[in-house]
Regions:
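Polytopic transmembrane helical bundles with strong interfacial aromatic enrichment
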Residues: 1-153
């Protein structure tokens, strides 16, 4: 099923999801390094900035994902896509709360933002798995396959 959110035939959603997934997942090791005392305040700042960058980067991923969601017609595929969508709609507010809890935080540092981010990263992994299933198993945003090698016109 070919994506409607594409440039030159290349679907955009798989490109855009790399940004929030990568940044959100990297924020957790930054948090752990800081909270276990293995690094200085720069790790705390890195966690905050990667979370905030992931939130900004999620916007084009959400928009292109929503466009692709609109092309799904098969019921089983729609169920998987709906679960993927719901998880992603939970992720954004979860990470926004984590950012607000960190903003301007002074000692003693709370573990709540780290705990929230941990669950966010777990949900990101589950959602990413489902997104991969939508592409590889259900063919969302995948061009129709050619029947044999290309021929000269």
């Amino acid at each position: 099923m070919k994506s409607k959110a594409a440039i030159a035939g290349h679907p955009l959603h798989p490109i855009f999801v790399c940004i929030p997934i990568g940044l959100w997942c990297f924020s957790l090791p930054c948090d752990l390094i800081y909270h276990f005392g293995w690094g200085d305040d720069s790790w705390k700042k890195a966690a905050l900035y990667t979370l905030a960058g992931g939130i900004v980067g999620a916007v084009p991923a959400y928009i292109t994902g929503w466009i692709d969601y609109g092309i799904i017609r098969e019921e089983k595929t729609a169920q998987v896509a709906k679960f993927h969508l719901i998880l992603n709609l939970l992720l954004l507010p979860l990470f926004i709360v984590s950012v607000f809890l960190r903003w301007g935080e002074t000692p003693p540092y709370s573990l709540w933002p780290v705990i929230i981010s941990f669950f966010g990263v777990v949900l990101t992994g589950i959602s990413g798995y489902l997104g991969g299933e939508l592409v590889s198993r259900y063919g969302i945003s995948v061009h129709d396959r050619h029947q044999g090698p290309p021929t000269k016109a």
